[in-house]
Amino acid sequence: MKKYLNLTALLLVGISNVTWANAVNELQNRLNKIDVLSADYTQQVTDAQGKKIQQGSGKIQLKRPNLFRMDNETPQESQIIADGKTLWFYDPFVEQVTANWVEDTLSDTPFVLLTSNNPSHWQQYIVEQKSDTFIIKPKSKKSTIKQFNIRIEKDGVLKNFSTIEKDGQSNLYILRKITNPALNDAIFTFTLPKGVEFDDQRKK
C-alpha cells in the first residue's frame, strides 16, 4: 500500500512540474511578442477587505530584454527603472534614491519578469495559468509579495498586472493607450539627481 502511495505522490509531483513548465512557456511566448511597449496606466490600491484606499496614474515603458521603467505621476511622483543590472527607485517627495542589483530584488519585484527570459529568474516563482491570467507566486518565504498576476492575451496584448502583498493589500495596474514605438535605451538609464540621499544597497 505504501508503495502505491509513494508512486501516486511521485506522479502528482510530475504532473505539477509539467503544469508549471507549460504555464511558464505559455507566458514567456506571449511576453516575447512584446519587443517594446509604452502605455499609460491607472492604479487601484485596495486593502485586504477589498476596499479601495487609493487611486493613481502614470506611464510604463518596456523593452526586451531586461529594460523596464515606471513613472508614477499621481497621487505622488515616483520612478522605478531597471537598466538590466540595477533596479533604481526614486522618491522625489523624500528626495531619496535606492539602488539594488536586479538579481537581489526578484522575489519582491516581479515586474522584472515582464522583460526577462532568464531561466534563473523564472525558477524563483511558481506559475499557474487561468485563461489569459497568469498567477505568479514567489518561492521565497521572505518575499513581501504574496503573488503577482499578469493578464496578457494570446497575441501579446498586455491588459493589466497586479501585486498582492502578504498583508492582503492589492495594487492593480490597468494599461491604456498602448503603443509599440522605438524606444532608445537611454530612456532606461537613471541619472542621480543632485542633492538627494542615495542608498546604494549594491555595496552591502
Curated annotation (Swiss-Prot):
Gene3D superfamilies per the UniProt record, alphabetical: Lipoprotein localisation LolA/LolB/LppX
Keywords per UniProt:
Chaperone, Periplasm, Protein transport, Signal, Transport
Extract the signal peptide range: 1-21
The record's family statement is: Belongs to the LolA family.
GO cellular component terms, semicolon-separated: outer membrane-bounded periplasmic space
Q: Which domain of life is it from?
A: Bacteria
What is the protein name stated in its UniProt record?
Outer-membrane lipoprotein carrier protein
Q: Where in the cell is it found?
A: Periplasm
* PANTHER family in the record: OUTER-MEMBRANE LIPOPROTEIN CARRIER PROTEIN
Q: Which organism is it from?
A: Histophilus somni (strain 2336)
Gene that this polypeptide is encoded by: lolA
Which cysteines pair up through disulfides? They are none
Q: Subunit comment for this entry? A: Monomer.
Job description of the protein: Participates in the translocation of lipoproteins from the inner membrane to the outer membrane. Only forms a complex with a lipoprotein if the residue after the N-terminal Cys is not an aspartate (The Asp acts as a targeting signal to indicate that the lipoprotein should stay in the inner membrane).
List GO BP terms, alphabetically. Answer: lipoprotein localization to outer membrane; lipoprotein transport
* Keyword Signal listed: yes
